[in-house]
Amino acid sequence: MKTGHFEIVTMLLATMILVDIFQVKAEVLDMADNAFDDEYLKCTDRMEIKYVPQLLKEEKASHQQLDTVWENAKAKWAARKTQIFLPMNFKDNHGIALMAYISEAQEQTPFYHLFSEAVKMAGQSREDYIYGFQFKAFHFYLTRALQLLRKPCEASSKTVVYRTSQGTSFTFGGLNQARFGHFTLAYSAKPQAANDQLTVLSIYTCLGVDIENFLDKESERITLIPLNEVFQVSQEGAGNNLILQSINKTCSHYECAFLGGLKTENCIENLEYFQPIYVYNPGEKNQKLEDHSEKNWKLEDHGEKNQKLEDHGVKILEPTQIPGMKIPEPFPLPEDKSQGNINNPTPGPVPVPGPKSHPSASSGKLLLPQFGMVIILISVSAINLFVAL
């Protein structure tokens, strides 16, 4: 039986696609400038309270795979959360996102690969993030989970963890720094290089989080490293292996992109360190917790105190409208606000008051005149009465 030209072309294309899928591709280690690296430092509460819960509902409804992964992790988290120490501000959605990513990453599922590739490319522009990134809520909750579980560098960087990859390449020169560009698991057991193409990364992380307590069974030390932690890269001996030493900083091209922040030309260092307070009391179900969480700011002097954000390349984007979703107006950036003053962020847009949300409504504060105005009104009334008499 003769095979037609069309059938031959189809078979060749199918073969090429299969080869591309199963081929182990070399990983380039660099600053991952196309990754979506927002840390939401200036808009954490606004995002968490006002926008992300609705985003999660919409993204789960439109992405069946995400919905399945989330619901499976939700059940695991419910059974696990009473057995581990947690910071006071650590919420269920943080734990669910963490459990979901750990499970999918360990099993190397299609969802893990889909999410990782999306994160690595969604930062090309704000439009790519807004229109093309399907995991905005998942990314937010996972980022916040790692921030809240973070410990001081002195405690986390003493022990080396390892990661292997097929033919990782790094171009030495300049600062010799790199970021992974996606959330990365590393292990305490050093693997043996099976061939010359396998690269072993020895990683000393400051901002990575030990996650073995989140697993169902005891295991070796496993560390989840944030995508934007900056490492100093050096070569180990004469082979392909590399040493990655954290500089105890992250850097980001984005800050509150969902609220209008544009991509900066340079990767801006984030100098905020979160000092969580941990709680553990599984026996008391209705335990009431007071929020004693605090942030210890380690701010460095980068020039004048009132240095403008424009000096760092921060730009403001006009609001972009997505069909079926409300995107808030971009946050204004005052000229006298310094880059380091992230403890007093610029107020966001005020929503239109709804029922019982305005101060004059029955559920709010009464709008009373000031005391001085009351005195003036009484005086005027008395004068008018005296004149009339």
UniProtKB/Swiss-Prot annotation:
The GO terms describing molecular function are: NAD+ poly-ADP-ribosyltransferase activity; NAD+-protein-arginine ADP-ribosyltransferase activity; nucleotidyltransferase activity
Superkingdom, taxonomy of origin: Eukaryota
Q: Which reaction does it catalyse?
A: L-arginyl-[protein] + NAD(+) = N(omega)-(ADP-D-ribosyl)-L-arginyl-[protein] + nicotinamide + H(+)
**What Pfam families does the record point to?**
ART
Q: What is this protein called?
A: Ecto-ADP-ribosyltransferase 3
Q: Which residues bind NAD(+)?
A: Y101, R163
Q: How does it sit in the membrane?
A: Lipid-anchor; GPI-anchor
Q: Which cysteines share a disulfide bond?
A: C43-C256
Q: What is its EC number?
A: 2.4.2.31
Which InterPro entries does this one have? ADP-ribosyltransferase_ARG, ART
**Keywords associated with the record:** Cell membrane, Disulfide bond, Glycoprotein, Glycosyltransferase, GPI-anchor, Lipoprotein, Membrane, NAD, NADP, Nucleotidyltransferase, Repeat, Signal, Transferase
Query: What organism, scientifically named, is this protein from?
Result: Homo sapiens
Entry keyword annotation includes Repressor: no
Q: Where in the cell is it found?
A: Cell membrane
Lipid-carrying residues in chain (GPI-anchor amidated serine): S362
Provide the residue intervals of the sequence repeats. Answer: 283-292, 293-302, 303-312
Instruction: Family membership, please give it.
Output: Belongs to the Arg-specific ADP-ribosyltransferase family.
Q: Where is this region: Disordered?
A: 325-362
Here the segments flagged for biased composition (Pro residues) are 346-356
**Gene3D superfamilies recorded:** Toxin ADP-ribosyltransferase, Chain A, domain 1
Signal in keyword set: yes
GO cellular component labels: extracellular exosome; extracellular region; plasma membrane; side of membrane
* Residue span of region 3 X 10 AA tandem repeats of [GS]-E-K-N-[QW]-K-L-E-D-H: 283-312
All residue ranges annotated as the TR mART core domain in the record:
64-251
Propeptide segment residues: 363-389
* Top enzyme category: transferase
